[in-house]
């Protein structure tokens, strides 16, 4: 009997296990990345964790997530490509959220040509994120660009922080229903300020395909993340 079919099944399980392992690694480091606004009564404990052994930091992290009601995803909880972003290191997922926000602001971003602005941009999304933005912004989108000229966000990009942009990217992806509301990406919400307000210009903006385009092109834009799409 040929072993072809079982091999395919094993590969699928192995890939899903890798996604779950990435999520678990994030969970065990939650004390390092959960935004301070979520710490609540555990804030004194979290504040002391940097000086403790990894096992104790992991225990604190899991306690923090349980207190906050973070999900425990199953192997099939990563079926949607966007849900698999929860398996990336949280810092990388936040960079990607900023890329999504900056795509929305691509018209404004075209004026960011001085050295200081480019360095700030690289700090937000990294060198690979800058390359991804350049590639995506070069796609044929003249009608979108003209449309954006008439609905620039009221808060200028220069006044935004990294957290602000990650939150804008989160809201844009959520508006597009990119991931399951009860899925693994809920954990990433904890990396953003608890009381972040919904940006009215995002809520009122016309629908676009930027998020879907970004997700579809992730394997070519970020080859090191190809394991997410195995």
Model-found features: residue ranges?
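General marker for long, soluble alpha-helical cores
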Residues: 1-230
């Amino acid at each position: 009997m040929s072993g072809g079919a079982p091999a395919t099944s094993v590969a699928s399980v192995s890939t899903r296990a890798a996604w779950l392992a990435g999520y678990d690694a994030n969970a065990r480091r939650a004390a390092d990345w959960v935004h301070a606004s979520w710490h609540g009564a555990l804030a004194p404990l979290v504040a002391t964790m940097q000086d403790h052994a990894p096992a104790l930091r992991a225990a604190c992290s899991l306690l923090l997530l349980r207190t906050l009601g973070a999900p425990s995803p199953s192997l099939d909880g990563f079926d949607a490509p966007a849900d698999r972003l929860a398996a990336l290191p949280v810092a990388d997922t936040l960079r990607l959220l900023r890329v999504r926000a900056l795509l929305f602001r691509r018209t404004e971003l075209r004026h960011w040509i001085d050295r200081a602005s480019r360095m700030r941009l690289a700090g937000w999304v990294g060198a690979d994120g800058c390359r991804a933005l350049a590639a995506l912004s070069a796609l044929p989108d003249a009608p979108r660009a003209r449309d954006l000229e008439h609905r620039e966000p009221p808060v200028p990009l220069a006044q935004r922080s990294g957290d602000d942009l990650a939150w804008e990217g989160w809201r844009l992806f959520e508006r597009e229903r990119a991931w399951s509301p009860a899925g693994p990406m809920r954990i990433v919400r904890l990396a953003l300020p608890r009381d972040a307000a919904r940006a009215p210009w995002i809520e009122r903006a016309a629908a676009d395909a930027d998020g879907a385009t970004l997700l579809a092109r992730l394997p070519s834009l970020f080859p090191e993340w190809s394991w997410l799409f195995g």
